[in-house]
Amino acid sequence: MSYFGTDGIRGKFGEMPITPEFALKLGFAAGKVLKRTSPINKPIVVLGKDTRLSGYILESALQAGLNAAGVYVHLLGPLPTPAIAHLTRALHADAGIVISASHNPYFDNGIKFFSGEGKKLPDSLQDEINQELEHELHIEDTANLGKSVRLIDANGRYIEFCKSTFPYHFDLRNLTIVVDCANGAAYNVGPSVFRELGAKVIALYNDPNGMNINEHCGSTHPENLQKAVVHYKADLGIAFDGDADRVILVDKFGELVDGDHILYILATQAKKKPAGIVGTVMSNMALELALAKADVPFIRAKVGDRYVLQALEENDWVTGGEPSGHILTLDKSTTGDAIIAALQVLTVMVEQNKALHELVTGFELFPQVLVNVRLDQMMDPYSVPALVSEFEQAEAQLKGRGRLLIRKSGTEPVIRVMVEGDNQKEVTDLAHRLAESVRTHAA
């Protein structure tokens, strides 16, 4: 049985596999694999988390399992997921582990691994850990147990790293920035980075209590940030998600600037244009057309930063992302980093001496309607000839003006029907008609 999904192991705390007992076994299994594959006798693992209450319990269980397997653990405390990836590399650790469920509610949690290079763990190592989990936890030699130590200045190290990605001769002294920390992992380091670069920072949702992470705040709920930017007459707003690997921006008028806008800015407005951009099947068609006009190659990957990263590496490109705000800049970081992505946009604002809204003037997203069809039992819509015929008719109707995407959820019995085009009413009507057809044929 494989416990790993596309983004590690995730679920509701207290239910398998997100339990203290499983975390202990997982730590031991991962430790045994690292002992076999590490070039040193005492492998080192960097362990961090977000601000969920359950993170403390899972942290204790994981470190106990790792120590029992003979692994040394550096405890980082609450830090963004990309910070754990960076510190894994900086400390020359054998692996990094993040305890987080990203943008999910507080009662969920998850565990994911980074390789020593700060990248997602290879599938081959995940398979080895899965196999090791089938064995009983058995300590053979107490003389070879590992230890855990707390890294005293983990926050400071990561703050300095983020600042190093911003041009040394630039500063943010003339900007007022509202930062929504989602009561998550960036509650401390996020505002600090922008303050230390000279900005006047107004921090929101930076008081985590273990249960308020992502609660009506952060990149998935930016409404209050939009109001705050206008209220404080700020230059822009920055919203992170719970583990700060996603970012959504807000211009001074309170308008949202999502991942597609950010990729547009980095591809067309920066002094140095990227060799190409990787989006996903969810990236707006307007981005594809705008990049073609700017003569910047664009390809689509499957949904998920793992697939964006894979496509970037295959094409030897550095910039890619998703509309949700997962932005990768591989010349700066090995994984999606909300703070660094925001800094790259701020770099363009400073070098062009333009406000955020000016960088996206003339770039308008096509209307996009997503309808989630919840089913009693999952089915493949492309296995039903009548549905396939309807999909083909819709694609012919939208040809050159829009597109259709029908996909199954990877985590629940849901079919996602997405229609995009240049006419809002047409897109809305088509999405709901196709969704109803899927619902009818699934009954």
Curated annotation (Swiss-Prot):
PROSITE patterns: PGM_PMM (PS00710). Keywords: Isomerase, Magnesium, Metal-binding, Phosphoprotein. Its cofactor is Mg(2+). One of its GO terms (cellular component) is cytosol. InterPro entries: A-D-PHexomutase_a/b/a-I, A-D-PHexomutase_a/b/a-I/II/III, A-D-PHexomutase_a/b/a-II, A-D-PHexomutase_a/b/a-III, A-D-PHexomutase_C, A-D-PHexomutase_C_sf, A-D-PHexomutase_CS, Alpha-D-phosphohexomutase_SF. Mg(2+) binds at residues 102, 241, 243, 245. The active site is at 102 (phosphoserine intermediate). It catalyses: alpha-D-glucosamine 1-phosphate = D-glucosamine 6-phosphate. GO terms for biological process: carbohydrate metabolic process; peptidoglycan biosynthetic process; UDP-N-acetylglucosamine biosynthetic process. Activated by phosphorylation. Gene3D superfamilies: Alpha-D-Glucose-1,6-Bisphosphate, subunit A, domain 3 (3.40.120.10), Alpha-D-phosphohexomutase, C-terminal domain (3.30.310.50). It holds the Pfam family PGM_PMM_III. Binds 1 Mg(2+) ion per subunit. Its EC number is 5.4.2.10. NCBIfam families: glmM, PRK10887.1. Belongs to the phosphohexose mutase family. Catalyzes the conversion of glucosamine-6-phosphate to glucosamine-1-phosphate. This is Phosphoglucosamine mutase. It comes from Acinetobacter baylyi (strain ATCC 33305 / BD413 / ADP1). The gene is glmM.
